Regions:
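Non-heme di-metal
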Residues: 2-195
Length: 195
């Protein structure tokens, strides 16, 4: 049997010839392409594309390389800041009785986080040398980071408590517990998948 893929919606048909009509998007047989060999993706996201296409590219001037790197990194930092600020604004809106506004801020924050993730993915190890292209390496690294973040936040909470700053103490102490939970969850995943 021959495989035929609809170039409009991706439906795969097996038969001697393409179907007269795609059962999903209803285009004609002319929109089907015979699959030769293995299926391949026309495009996909790639980790560290900056290093692969810009960093050592002799056709790009040093000035443009610096500009591209600086802008990618600045955009990453900006997107991360927006995530925190938008979630803060969502909390304010909810407290003021504007739940729809709060929910939109939360949606926008998630989109900004997606943007930050894409900038991080493009920059790869040029953004953070410990970040790698493999799940195992990233789990190992982040387990250590979460345990460190737990200790750092706990120390800040203790200092706030010593100075009778209850609002700061309570919030940061709860965050320390969140970091501990993250660390334990990531450690469990590391052990489950990578022994």
């Amino acid at each position: 049997m021959t495989k035929w893929v609809c170039t409009v919606c991706g439906y795969v048909y097996e038969g001697d010839a393409a179907p007269a009509e795609c059962p999903v998007c209803h285009v004609g047989a002319d929109k089907f392409k015979k699959v030769e060999g293995d299926l391949t993706l026309a495009a996909e996201h790639e980790y560290g594309v900056y290093a692969k296409t810009v960093k050592n590219n002799p056709e790009i001037s040093d000035e443009d390389k610096k500009y591209i790197f600086d802008q990618l990194k600045a955009n990453f930092v900006g997107e991360c800041s927006e995530v925190g600020m938008y979630l803060c604004m969502a909390r304010i809106a909810h407290r003021e009785g504007y739940p729809e506004v709060g929910l939109y801020w939360e949606k926008a924050a998630y989109e900004e986080a997606e943007h930050a993730a894409k900038f991080a993915e493009m920059l790869g190890e040029d953004l953070e040398p410990n970040m790698k292209a493999t799940t195992k390496d990233n789990l190992k690294w982040r387990v250590d980071c979460e345990f460190g973040a737990t200790a750092g936040k706990f120390d800040l909470a203790k200092c706030a408590k010593k100075n009778n700053l209850d609002a700061i103490h309570d919030t940061v102490h709860e965050m320390a517990r969140d970091e501990a939970r993250h660390g334990k969850a990531l450690q469990g995943l590391l052990e489950r998948y990578f022994g």
